[in-house]
Amino acid sequence: MPIIEPGDKSLKDLAGLHLWHGELSSCSQRVRITLEEKNLDWNSHIISIPKNEHATPEYQAIHPYGLVPAFVDNGVLLIESCDIITYLDENYSKFSLQPNDTKDQITMSNWLISADKAQADLKLLSHEFLFRPRKKMSSEELEAFSKNHNNQTLVTFIKEWQIGNIFSKEKLDGSVNRTDAYFSKLDNILKNQKWIAGEKMSLADIAWMPNIHRMSLMDWPLDRYLNLTRWFDQVKLHSSYQVALVNWENDGQAEGFRAYVKRRKIETGIHVTEFGSLTKPASL
């Protein structure tokens, strides 16, 4: 896994575990869940995405792409969430989060890769179906963000989201189709086993917990996947789900998302189920 040379050299002098993260960031949620499952003490550094704190020179000296999370372990910097949770499990062996069986280990690794690939679609769907009520940037603020942020891929995405009232149908259909395909594959795997990579909870489950939670907030029809729904029900029984994910949401935030989703559907007809493969009955 890639260890990053920090632009901020003072990070090399940091003792202990440090996490720069966003409350609602799904990638941050993965890392917090892993830290909680492994009962590790860590230092929290909140980066407010709505306030564009990820676009500051100070933060981009920590994370060169201006994304969250960033993680430091006694001076060692990592920036990809699946790399971070794998690092934590390999370097802090108490409460192992990897399967014992070699075949299951390969399954886990493949689903970590899939979770990473699914991130772009999760981002697009979240911004469309949950984050639209966020205050729009003024033209001056958007210009400043574009100038200050080093990550041009993110800048292009934010500009498109800020300027338009809805992403293109082509993009939304594609993101829905790919997400539905992943969920269907997970549902099929979970038909014959308790967890994604066997009979033990692993990093694969942690990597996908935030995604399913996020989709539940936007009223994604999870009842299309009976086994995945059963899995999510047992996930929610883990204290790490509550402590490291739900408790970081502001009071009433989940209810606010759900109310917005319902209101938008009534007023405009726009809802995630109006796109891609979700417009068709679930495959049996």
Specify the residue positions occupied by each region the protein language model found.
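Long, positively charged, glycine-interspersed low-complexity recognition regions
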Residues: 229-284
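Active-site-flanking alpha-helical
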Residues: 89, 211-212, 245
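Positions that flank functional sites
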Residues: 49-50, 201, 250-251
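GST-like domain detector, emphasizing the conserved glutathione-binding G-site
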Residues: 1-152, 264, 271-284
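GST-like fold's C-terminal all-alpha helical module
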Residues: 120-237, 284
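Short, hydrophobic secondary-structure boundary micro-motifs
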Residues: 95-100, 121-122, 196-199, 242-246
